[in-house]
């Protein structure tokens, strides 16, 4: 068992990584799909200090696989650590994204469907309904008793224009218990610092950096749709893609009202393995 | 039954030819005239060939081979279709839109200048 685990790790380490050209977004999805056969391993973290509650680190690790050019599937494992409280595994999610239009258009829709089974989650990968500071005041042992088995759907709209990417997400989430539908939004824009590539190979060329702005928040639920008692965040975001290596992302984000956490610091690392299953078939 | 056999064989052969045509280069027929005629702002520039080579190595080589010779079912980019029949505008269109039913993804996430640099590199392969 131990030998086979080490073998798998060695194979993964020897696999040819790719420059992922990821967008520097933490919450917003762009319409760009994972290339078929590629596996993207991502770790995302959010650090925050809600007023009246302990500082926390919410994390998830994601395995994103390109099944087809028009279908990307992703599995998440979530966890969190709260100061003066505990470190816990908070659950898992499985999402699928489908691109119905097989050519590039001015606006490109993607349908997102996710099942999640979490409790006490603090990764803040989306904000919906009346999510806000009160959720973070509950100690972990109590929050864990509230199991959230949810179906989350998104309409992802994305455009690329003159190097800019503009992405909008409309979110609808339903707890499979008797809770009402909750709604949220996210949008983001970004652009590489330089559009043309350099003739020489370089790690820190301007085209390897992308910068942008991201904003997201809740829109209430079916019975109380709107901005009342909802949280909203906005912040600049940047990433750097190492040549044939990982992409590192960072974003300080700011709560826009008293219902939001005043500041969130997000950082992530992603690493793409090209033609993942080909490794195990002993070829390309 | 036997009387219909030649017609049946003809139909099968025609279907096979049509399937082959669809699987190999049918995308060329779908390129709009405006894209077909686009000119490459980097056409023939040695710096763009070098930059395009770097982009190719990072994003394309795993599927199409280190020297664009093709890998297993992934096609070679040194064929007559790519080097002679397709214009630079055609290749740019293919990179933007992909041929998603055939497994070629869209590369619209790369900025347009990088796509043209990649086209410049691909077109340099026949020289």
Q: Which positions does each model-derived feature cover?
A:
Chain A
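Sec-dependent signal peptide recognition
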Residues: 2-9
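Transmembrane beta-barrel domains of Gram-negative outer membranes and organellar outer membranes
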Residues: 20-284
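N-terminal signal peptide c-region/cleavage motif recognized by signal peptidases
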Residues: 15-17
